[in-house]
Amino acid sequence: MAIHLYKTSTPSTRNGTVDSQVKSNPRNNLIYGQHHCGKGRNARGIITARHRGGGHKRLYRKIDFRRNEKDIYGRIVTIEYDPNRNAYICLIHYGDGEKRYILHPRGAIIGDTIVSGTEVPIKMGNALPLTDMPLGTAIHNIEITLGKGGQLARAAGAVAKLIAKEGKSATLKLPSGEVRLISKNCSATVGQVGNVGVNQKSLGRAGSKRWLGKRPVVRGVVMNPVDHPHGGGEGRAPIGRKKPTTPWGYPALGRRSRKRNKYSDNLILRRRSK
């Protein structure tokens, strides 16, 4: 990713950066519109995810997470921006005439060929079952349920590692640090997701953040007591508690948020590291 800096003329252009190489020109048969009604609300209209709302209209790109074009070589034609994720996407032209979008693997360029199947080369961008991969392979877009498509390690710069295979299961180290078991028959894509430097970009101004659908974050200590446990007091007052809390009164630091007694508890060998 090439970070482009503008010549200084206003504070927003002075501090902001953009990607000067990747554009967006999606194919009409691989996009569709979505009714933007989220705003962080549930079906009852109650806020369940704070600081969301607004943003520019988006067209959803149909991404091939299943990679079920078996043993048919495809060529990378374009590398495009996707407003629905922080990773880039590639348009693939397959030998049988099929055209699909996939996540852009790090280092892939226009003209490279990819393929998916059971006995394909261990090459960046190729998709194959975990049972056919050697130990230590860097992978992304990993299936949890066979045939459902990749669900793990799909964000920009994400990469997991195959560290063991025993019986019917494979052991993976995920980007979060979690070590868990996956069926060896599940598929994954070789390599790392592209756009590794996404965290190095600077939006430069508040308006760029609002275009992404993200609203301002207000500190609890400047709110009223009715709005937050940290609120209230005369002037600049401390939070008035031994430890910081969430807006709902739960401990804010170190509290585990994962639900208990989930079916996948037995598959997790080591919980994620914070």
UniProtKB/Swiss-Prot annotation:
User: Mind listing the UniProt keywords for this protein, alphabetically?
Assistant: Chloroplast, Plastid, Ribonucleoprotein, Ribosomal protein
Subunit record text = Part of the 50S ribosomal subunit.
Q: What biological process terms from GO does the record include?
A: translation
In this chain, composition skew of type Polar residues spans 7-24
Classification from the root reads: Eukaryota, Viridiplantae, Streptophyta, Embryophyta, Tracheophyta
Q: State the source organism's domain of life.
A: Eukaryota
UniProt-recorded name of the protein? Large ribosomal subunit protein uL2cz/uL2cy
**Which terms does the record give in the GO molecular function aspect?**
rRNA binding; structural constituent of ribosome; transferase activity
Q: Which SUPFAM superfamilies match?
A: Nucleic acid-binding proteins (SSF50249), Translation proteins SH3-like domain (SSF50104)
